[in-house]
Amino acid sequence: QERYGFKYLCADERNELAKVGADFIQSYQSKVPFLLVLSFINPHDICFVMPSKTRPPFEKAYKREPEIKMAVDSLSRIADSMPVGFFETDASAPLPKNLQPTVNNIYDNGRLISDKTDSEWRRYIWMYHRMVEIVDAQIGKVLDALDKSPLKDNTIVIMTSDHGEMRGSHQMIGKNIQYEEAQRVPLIFAGRGIKKGMDDKSVICNVWDLLPTMCEMASIANVPNYEGISLYGLVTEGKPLLKRDYIYLESLQSYQIIKQGRYKYTVREASGLPCMFTDLKVDSLETMNLIEKPQYQDVITELKVILDEELEHRQIVLDENGWRNSKGRVK
């Protein structure tokens, strides 16, 4: 608690965490409001399922966290026990419609996994679905505890994630990739005061917005000069967000993105092409790079200006070593 400023309840993100969270809720007697954060690791273990020529061996990760190997091996044994031919059809796990790489792609850079068969991809996706089921059950244990608790009517639950999973789209897996599969995450609010039945996939927001939203929900001051905006009015009354018409994104893989409605403009430091442009209304699966299409040049110019302004604001420049700011290489 002295190190972090809060009490650290559990180091086991796979098995014990759900019980610890449920026990905390069931035993909580104080009148003081609380913030309970349960960071379930899965389905992140899927990152250690599919070896490839383009991916480093998993031995270091296994040595660092033996629990990873135990979890992966357990599911692998179940996958191996399935009937012969089980992964030969989409009945086991449908392949993504955009399994093939993007035409005129700027993001190969060793990330494509082109040495796998359709059956191997289905096995991978099937295991991913099982990991989602596992964490779904764990979250369910916590929600069941809350449902039986006096805290139920005075608690707000937020479910989200720090990144998505490519899951075979564009022959890629993992995160740190500019595609929608890796960028989009669930953001679910439930509980006291939350507007019921609302499902809005068009909202331009990200995890920056969690802090100001929770601060407003708790009637406490937000951090000064913080970039995020509160979603409180949206999730409680359905009020539209008026302060943002685009979002800026960056990644470990050194790309910079401006996403504005249906359009996405991406720049990467190390590629054969300078940038990528996608019209998500026309090509929701991002199968084509439209950067050279004449009909989009005005939009591309506008997004480039916005990106340049963002980079200037953040003091980020591109030199021979990649994207850098005043603190060094952008990560």
Show where each model-derived region lies:
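Active-site-proximal alpha/beta segments of enzymes that process anionic O-linked groups
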Residues: 1-32, 44
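Short glycine-enriched, charge-decorated loop/helix-capping segments at active-site entrances
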Residues: 7-8, 173-175, 292-295
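C-terminal cap/loop subdomain of S1 sulfatases and analogous C-terminal strand-loop tails that border
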Residues: 17-21, 163-169, 195-196, 208-280, ...
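Non-transmembrane alpha-helical segments in soluble domains
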Residues: 22-26, 129-132, 136-143, 147, ...
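Active-site-proximal cap/lid insertion segments
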Residues: 27-32, 40-154, 158-204, 217-220, ...
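Structural motif
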Residues: 33-35, 182, 262, 275
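Hydrophobic/aromatic beta-strand patches that form the interior of the parallel beta-sheet core
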Residues: 36, 156-158, 266, 278
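Long, internal low-complexity/basic segments
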Residues: 51, 98-123, 131, 135, ...
